[in-house]
Amino acid sequence: MNESILDGKRILTVDDEPEILELLEEEILIACPNCKVDKATTYKRAVILLESTIYDIVVLDIMGVRGFDLLNLAVSRNFRVAMLTAHALNPQALKKAFEMKARTYLPKEKLGEVVPFLEDVMKYEYLPGWKRLFEKLKGFFDSRFESDWDKKTGLNWREWGKVCL
């Protein structure tokens, strides 16, 4: 097995569903057994961890734990953040995550593929990382969102090519 860029990293996962946290931890540790994964099921616990610990990546659920409030705190501490959602899977939430400087926006349906997305969060800077996300999930987003969602939200990522090279 190839060594992952996540190996040895400290990751905080936050979701109000303990089974999602268990699945995230399992997926991460299978690929990167030397990762340290902390978990929080409440906003309050997440704030305590975010304020007291340095993380390489923070994975935040949007809905049940006030994810956008936690995103603001995590970004203010210069943590790389991956937003995770099922209920807020819409172009407006995606745009908000982008504007608030999250590094990626993952549908919970893609939890089985979380490690490559988190590796991209570590490998790529902000715009190149989002461009890579859209390249990987364009078909998925197109099937879930209205047509031209990217243009209507102003997230016309195809135009970022020159910026991201």
Model-predicted regions and their roles:
Residues N2, D7-E19, L24-I28:
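Conserved acidic segment of CheY-like receiver
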Residues E25, K39-I57:
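Acidic, metal-coordinating helix/loop segments flanking the phosphotransfer/catalytic sites
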Residues P33, K123-L165:
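C-terminal output/effector regions of signal-responsive regulators
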Residues T41-T42, M63-D69:
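Acidic catalytic/metal-coordinating carboxylates
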Residues E51-T53, L73-R80, M100:
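Conserved phosphotransfer cores of two-component systems
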Residues D69, S76, A88-P116, E135:
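Alpha4 helix (beta4-alpha4-beta5 surface) of REC/receiver domains from two-component response regulators
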Residues V59, M63, A74, N78-Q92:
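A short, hydrophobic beta-strand element within the central beta-sheet of small alpha/beta folds
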Residues E26-A31, L49, K96:
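Alpha-helical interaction/dimerization surfaces of two-component signaling modules
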